[in-house]
Amino acid sequence: MSFALYGLGPSTGLHDNDESDTLYKLNLAYMPKENQTWYATVSEGFRRGGVNAVPTEGSFIEEAGWVPFASDSVLNLEFGAKGITKRDVFYNMSIYRIDWNDPQLNTDTPNYSFYAVINGDEAQTTGLDIELKGSVGKIDWDLGYARNKSDLRADLVTPASVPSIYAPKGAGLPGTPEDMVNVGLAYTSYLDNGWGIVHRANMYYQSDMKNHLSTSLGYSQLLDSFTIGDISSTLFSDDMYVSFFVKNLMNERGVTGMFKSESFGPNPAAGFYGSNDREFIALPRTVGISIEKSF
């Protein structure tokens, strides 16, 4: 594959793939009580393969093995229970396991650091989700917790003519915090004129996580944990809502992704004078008023 870069060479490339199979899903549910359900789900998933925009001719050449990547598939197992307790607390709890076969993983090429997807051998995700909702007087509350662990179950090997280990077995998959918590409170009251007012406070927390699968310090960075809080007050009637809100009350930076300057910044030696380094951050503190009217 070649492509025009700095006006050099034609843009060409052709790769085909054709796959056909059947995906299965089985769900079983049992109600031991009227307000309680147990369930189990087994399902399969598939994602097609593709090609990377990696040059193999002309300038900035990479090996041809970095161009195509194959499909991947998953087997998902999930067990859970949901219902309502005697104190009117709604709950939804589940545990799950996802086995990845030939997982498509984001990497970079060795010569000029082009973005490239390659196939690993095996990966696995395990976790649990807990959701609770209830009321105490005029206060409605909700609580959520998620635990997630995702890692490689075999070394990730590059598709080069002389393969090398890009990430070792046991390496955690990027972009997946192990712990996430959300809490919400809402207090509702009514005025003599028929209008109501509801005050809300919400909090979200996530633990630290990796931004990149590579073990190279030029790419990999452990992103800090963060907590984001929102508050709002809404005056409402049957056909109108007036809300005052503050999002990200503490103005938390909340970095969820990063392209480090060491690898994505200027590199005059390679003829690159621009910069592609950046961070993905949470919405900064935002204060506002919204008005809705139904007609």
Regions found by a protein language model. Give the residues of each.
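Extracytoplasmic loops and strand-loop junctions of Gram-negative outer membrane beta-barrel proteins
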Residues: 4-12, 58-65, 110-116, 163-171, ...
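Gram-negative outer-membrane beta-barrel transporters
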Residues: 90-100, 118-213, 290-294
